[in-house]
Amino acid sequence: MTRIKRGYIARRRRTKIRLFASSFRGAHSRLTRTMTQQRIRALVSAHRDRGRRKRDFRRLWITRINAVIQEMEVFNSYNRFIHNLYKKQVLLNRKILAQIALLNRSCLYTISNEIIK
C-alpha cells in the first residue's frame, strides 16, 4: 500500500486560516500556530461582542428616550412612560421611539399626550 502524505489537505487548511488572518499584525498573520490562536480569539470576541452590541444599542435608545422625556416634563421618568405605553397597548419598541425622539419630537409629544388621556 502506498503512503499518503496529506500535504494538500494541511496546506488547504492553512491557507484558509491565512486568508482569515491576513489583516492581523506581526507574527499573527505569518506564523501558523499564532494564526490559529488569533483566529480562535477573534471568533470568540466576535461572538461575545454581538451580544454586547445588542445591549449597548438598547442602552443608547433608552438614554435618548429618557432625555426627551425629561424635557417634556409630562412624565417624571422613562419607566413611567414605558409603563403607560404598555397599559395603553401602544406597540412601539425602544428603537422606534428613539428614532422618533431624535427626528420628530412633536410626534413623541402627541404620543405622550394620547397616553395620558
From Swiss-Prot:
<dbReference type="GO" id="GO:0000027">
    <property type="term" value="P:ribosomal large subunit assembly"/>
</dbReference>
<dbReference type="GO" id="GO:1990904">
    <property type="term" value="C:ribonucleoprotein complex"/>
</dbReference>
<comment type="similarity">
    <text>Belongs to the bacterial ribosomal protein bL20 family.</text>
</comment>
<dbReference type="GO" id="GO:0003735">
    <property type="term" value="F:structural constituent of ribosome"/>
</dbReference>
<keyword id="KW-0699">rRNA-binding</keyword>
<keyword id="KW-0689">Ribosomal protein</keyword>
<protein>
    <recommendedName>
        <fullName>Large ribosomal subunit protein bL20c</fullName>
    </recommendedName>
</protein>
<dbReference type="GO" id="GO:0009507">
    <property type="term" value="C:chloroplast"/>
</dbReference>
<dbReference type="GO" id="GO:0006412">
    <property type="term" value="P:translation"/>
</dbReference>
<keyword id="KW-0694">RNA-binding</keyword>
<comment type="function">
    <text>Binds directly to 23S ribosomal RNA and is necessary for the in vitro assembly process of the 50S ribosomal subunit. It is not involved in the protein synthesizing functions of that subunit.</text>
</comment>
<dbReference type="GO" id="GO:0005840">
    <property type="term" value="C:ribosome"/>
</dbReference>
<dbReference type="InterPro" id="IPR005813">
    <property type="entry name" value="Ribosomal_bL20"/>
</dbReference>
<keyword id="KW-0150">Chloroplast</keyword>
<dbReference type="InterPro" id="IPR035566">
    <property type="entry name" value="Ribosomal_protein_bL20_C"/>
</dbReference>
<dbReference type="Pfam" id="PF00453">
    <property type="entry name" value="Ribosomal_L20"/>
</dbReference>
<keyword id="KW-0934">Plastid</keyword>
<dbReference type="GO" id="GO:0019843">
    <property type="term" value="F:rRNA binding"/>
</dbReference>
<keyword id="KW-0687">Ribonucleoprotein</keyword>
